[in-house]
Amino acid sequence: MEKTLETVPLERKKREKEQFRKLFIGGLSFETTEESLRNYYEQWGKLTDCVVMRDPASKRSRGFGFVTFSSMAEVDAAMAARPHSIDGRVVEPKRAVAREESGKPGAHVTVKKLFVGGIKEDTEEHHLRDYFEEYGKIDTIEIITDRQSGKKRGFGFVTFDDHDPVDKIVLQKYHTINGHNAEVRKALSRQEMQEVQSSRSGRGGNFGFGDSRGGGGNFGPGPGSNFRGGSDGYGSGRGFGDGYNGYGGGPGGGNFGGSPGYGGGRGGYGGGGPGYGNQGGGYGGGYDNYGGGNYGSGSYNDFGNYNQQPSNYGPMKSGNFGGSRNMGGPYGGGNYGPGGSGGSGGYGGRSRY
């Protein structure tokens, strides 16, 4: 059927819903099969897809997989019932991360703290609480103000009692709070960002995402693993999310994770330079572990380059998850489990789902 202006939004809506229904399941026993994985997760609802990732040559499990539910409510029910134990092993379920997001700084880091940008002067703590408490139990809310003038800097933090609310919230790029557009991020301290950044230079291969030259690495315990980046690191060879123009875009002096770094060096989220967005203006700096630079540019409402096409959460059977070299199977390469030499270059495939 020929696509029309009416059918395209419907198809996009359907695809976006599917993206929110996918869970990544890490730490699987090598004995776990699709059947046992499906049998376990079907206690929370109907699965539309279930896969255990395997080496294309040996057919040995890589220790992780994906399940896709028929509704977002079923995903929420499954996550609310953690911990999960399959075949005698406690596994790690997480919301699947989009392909475009997977190479960005902190995309796979587990945190309970959420950064909220775009907070206006008329937005108070209770507005944030009313909006975000539907996602999970909130521990603390902070709206950052200027120490001298007392005026709001335009950003704040919401801390939950669990990481899953944060994972769920950041899947949705745009949020409207008190009538204003807001944007959310995982809030990583300077130490956490330095750990993420330093992992790029560690031994072993990369995460299996991003540049297909990575590969050769493991997602879990084993030689040269523990989220260590290879020659191209966690995303591309130019660092974490190079060219990611922060809040409002522009030339930047470090941007949101360009080559100067997302937490160290001159720029980035906790760096000592221009920082989160482009030069000048923005959300100010010098807050606790989060700032030595500015949190963004004065053109926050431009939303930088965030207006992207819908992303694919988790590998899709016809599109796959990342690089362009590994065409060895529908879900590509890379390793998750202990040991092993890793895949041959990320999640393979050029096409989209």
UniProtKB/Swiss-Prot annotation:
GO molecular function (one): pre-mRNA intronic binding
Post-translational modification: Sumoylated in exosomes, promoting miRNAs-binding. Asymmetric dimethylation at Arg-266 constitutes the major methylation site. According to a report, methylation affects subcellular location and promotes nuclear localization. According to another report, methylation at Arg-266 does not influence nucleocytoplasmic shuttling.
Protein name: Heterogeneous nuclear ribonucleoproteins A2/B1
Modified residues (N6-acetyllysine): 168, 173
Gly residues bias (residue ranges): 202-223, 320-353
Subunit composition and interactions: Homodimer; dimerization is required for nucleocytoplasmic translocation. Identified in the spliceosome C complex. Identified in a IGF2BP1-dependent mRNP granule complex containing untranslated mRNAs. Interacts with IGF2BP1. Interacts with C9orf72. Interacts with DGCR8. Interacts with TARDBP. Interacts with CKAP5. Interacts with TBK1. Interacts with STING1. Interacts with SRC. Interacts with PPIA/CYPA. Interacts (via C-terminus) with FAM76B; the interaction results in retention of HNRNPA2B1 in the nucleus and inhibition of the NF-kappa-B-mediated inflammatory pathway.
Function: Heterogeneous nuclear ribonucleoprotein (hnRNP) that associates with nascent pre-mRNAs, packaging them into hnRNP particles. The hnRNP particle arrangement on nascent hnRNA is non-random and sequence-dependent and serves to condense and stabilize the transcripts and minimize tangling and knotting. Packaging plays a role in various processes such as transcription, pre-mRNA processing, RNA nuclear export, subcellular location, mRNA translation and stability of mature mRNAs. Forms hnRNP particles with at least 20 other different hnRNP and heterogeneous nuclear RNA in the nucleus.
In-chain residues carrying the UniProt-annotated modification Phosphotyrosine: 331, 347
InterPro entries named among the record's database cross-references: HnRNPA1/A2_C, hnRNPA2B1_RRM1, Nucleotide-bd_a/b_plait_sf, RBD_domain_sf, RRM_dom
Residues bearing PTM Omega-N-methylarginine: 38, 203, 213, 228, 238, 266, 325, 350
Domain notes: The disordered region, when incubated at high concentration, is able to polymerize into labile, amyloid-like fibers and form cross-beta polymerization structures, probably driving the formation of hydrogels. In contrast to irreversible, pathogenic amyloids, the fibers polymerized from LC regions disassemble upon dilution. A number of evidence suggests that formation of cross-beta structures by LC regions mediate the formation of RNA granules, liquid-like droplets, and hydrogels.
Modified residues (Phosphothreonine): 4, 140, 159, 176
GO CC terms: cytoplasm; extracellular exosome; nucleoplasm; nucleus; ribonucleoprotein complex; spliceosomal complex
Protein species of origin: Mus musculus (Mouse)
Positions of post-translational N-acetylmethionine modification: 1
Site of covalent link Glycyl lysine isopeptide (Lys-Gly) (interchain with G-Cter in SUMO2): 22, 104, 112, 120, 137, 152, 168, 173, 186
Any coiled-coil regions, as ranges: none
Modified-residue entries (Phosphoserine), positions: 29, 85, 149, 189, 201, 212, 225, 231, 236, 259, 324, 341, 344
UniProt modified residues of type Dimethylated arginine: 203, 213
Main location group: nucleus
Locus of motif Nuclear localization signal: 9-15
SUPFAM superfamilies assigned: RNA-binding domain, RBD
